């Protein structure tokens, strides 16, 4: 992979934007290195150009991560080939590390340029994106370069120390503090240039920042008492009010704003199917999201004659290379995610999800269930379910429901005073939500002390190689040992190892 000197720092912070402006693309570490050394490159790039490229690249990375990793690790989908995720034979997944740090280069430089120009709103929006990308990295790997990745001092530029996950999330200048600062900045003057997410709407950026704060607080709630801080945000800060506030990137269908899965060959795209567990959950609820998440097994027949009922099934998580008992014949992913012959809407309709109103509502439902806030858990839960169904354009008529009220009252999707009723609907709503669907499943699994039976909507993958234990993290990329050896090996000592079962701070209960 690329030798990006572990991180994208001051000298190369704006390389992604420069390449985009030149009509080039990220192809190799050698190309990046040669550009980094170009003495004729401009010393200043417009913050809006940097921000556009940082948002686009980070969201597109998130889409790809969810397709290959998050959906599968959370058991919403299953790999039918090269099933290392489902069989629990995890590695570094270096693209997650490399591409996220590359995106951070543009985002951090946009933040710096905006701060120097006194553009508070631009700086605030960049902080939101920076916090989101760093949260993905630390929740995937554990301890990572953070403080020195931000400062970009001469030594740290090439050999950044690893911060502990606790410091990254909760410390001074940590993610929670940065998001709080972002909210304050977004209340001030300036403008958000190059904003392909919210078209310069600072109020929407504030709502996203506050929703992210709730998400992070929930992730660390087994390590710290976060109830008061969570309640204070709910009581006094602006939050998402509907799907109109969703943190999503809409693609145009044309390069470079093309949904990242569209260029795949169909055979490669079809190596992922809806999972047995997701199919079972949707089928038992008679849930119309089935028709969005999955493509019918008899798609060609249904396409020719829509009166013929569509049929669906799921593929098992696990490996057929170990045991033939793993069924890999599930329905492939739906038309919304790929331009199948005769169905080319993915190019212009697919979106990259950072965070949705539905997820926020499930966070509020869980907080109410826990007694952190005085709101009604069932109301927030129903709002989350409805928001997810509406986002995916649910057609209740296709499944026999009169409307949402009929569905929520009679399908079994409603809140039944149990935490699992919230968990299951949140899980179904987080399809293609980066790696956060896996982070949530990992949190629930840890809360239940690794007892799969206490999470009835998922299960240990068949023929897995890890003793039915859900992996806790991705391994550090192998080239870290040669690029940043002292800090890399020190991080492994502090973390207690570099295996898929090493417990990072948030899950070390």
Language model region names:
Residues 29-80, 84-91, 98, 109, ...:
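Membrane-proximal, proline-rich intrinsically disordered regions
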Residues 37-40, 149-151, 245, 295, ...:
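Short capping/connector residues at structural and topological boundaries
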Residues 45-48, 75-129, 133-394, 415-419, ...:
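Structured, solvent-exposed acidic/aromatic patches
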Residues 1-37:
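Bacterial Sec-dependent N-terminal signal peptides
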Residues 389, 393-509:
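C-terminal functional modules
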Residues 23-24, 300, 453:
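Residues in and immediately flanking transmembrane alpha helices
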Residues 30-33, 341, 399-404:
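Short acidic (Asp/Glu) and glycine-rich catalytic loops that position anionic groups and cofactors
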